[in-house]
Amino acid sequence: MSKLIPAIKVNNLSFYYDTQKILEGVSMEIYQSKVTAIIGPSGCGKSTFLKCLNRMNELESEVRVEGRVEFFNQNIYERRVNLNRLRRQVSMVHPKPNLFPMSVYDNVAYGVKIVGWRPKLEIDDIVESALKDADLWDEIKHKIHKSALDLSGGQQQRLCIARALAVKPKVLLMDEPCFGLDPIASMKVESLIQSLRLRSELTMVIVSHNLPQISRISDFTAFFKGNESRIGQLVEFGLTKKIFNSPHDSRTREYVLSRLG
């Protein structure tokens, strides 16, 4: 294996909603150009952890973070950090497609236009490239100026991925990207993730309950579980093959066996 370079370093991270502690003492590294999966039972703080990686949790009120999250050696929780820039570099795809009520083209171009003025032909190229990167161009190139809301659920989710890719992030966070999709649509999203994994230097972090899928698409896996007080903690982190086949912790083993049968 080539030398692993951390894109994100998490050190002793704890997270609170008001006075309620959701995460406690999480430390791990997310490696550049690798796919890291976050697994664990419902309610153990997986999605909360994901949103800590680009400060999306701060869109809600009364939150508090302790510890450090470093993105290429810069603490993202320093006051001087530009949040818009951070969230372009560490972009996020949510469980359900959150498209704007506008055309396919405008959905993809939206983030590009916010960054600054560019000639229309350049934006056209960016939109086409992002849709191709999301394995969507051939399916919808004849209707990119029609409403994005008319697409199927699977196409809408891949369009959200295209929109994220259009701003050239270094890290892509995906929270249950196949949530609610039928098996065929889910497989297309999985194939897209595999394709991005093989042909790009994009770092991806994926939260999922679908362990068979995670075993196929991820390089590393982190297992989270709530303690006796239902506070989410990192139980074990390592190569996906190791976590799935010979984990160190009995709690990891029990969870993996219960999900895989």
UniProtKB/Swiss-Prot annotation:
Note the topology in the membrane. Answer: Peripheral membrane protein
Please list the reactions this protein catalyses. phosphate(out) + ATP + H2O = ADP + 2 phosphate(in) + H(+)
GO-annotated molecular function: ATP binding; ATP hydrolysis activity; ATPase-coupled phosphate ion transmembrane transporter activity
Q: What is its main location?
A: membrane
Under the heading PROSITE patterns, the entry gives: ABC_TRANSPORTER_1, ABC_TRANSPORTER_2, PSTB
- The chain positions of domain ABC transporter read 8-256
Question: Which Pfam families does the UniProt record give?
Answer: ABC_tran
A single BP term in Gene Ontology: phosphate ion transmembrane transport
Q: Top-level EC class, please?
A: translocase
Q: Which UniProt keywords apply?
A: ATP-binding, Cell inner membrane, Cell membrane, Membrane, Nucleotide-binding, Phosphate transport, Translocase, Transport
GO-annotated cellular components: plasma membrane
NCBIfam families from the UniProt entry: PRK14258.1
Homology family: Belongs to the ABC transporter superfamily. Phosphate importer (TC 3.A.1.7) family.
Query: What's this protein's name?
Result: Phosphate import ATP-binding protein PstB 4
Q: Which organism is it from?
A: Trichormus variabilis (strain ATCC 29413 / PCC 7937) (Anabaena variabilis)
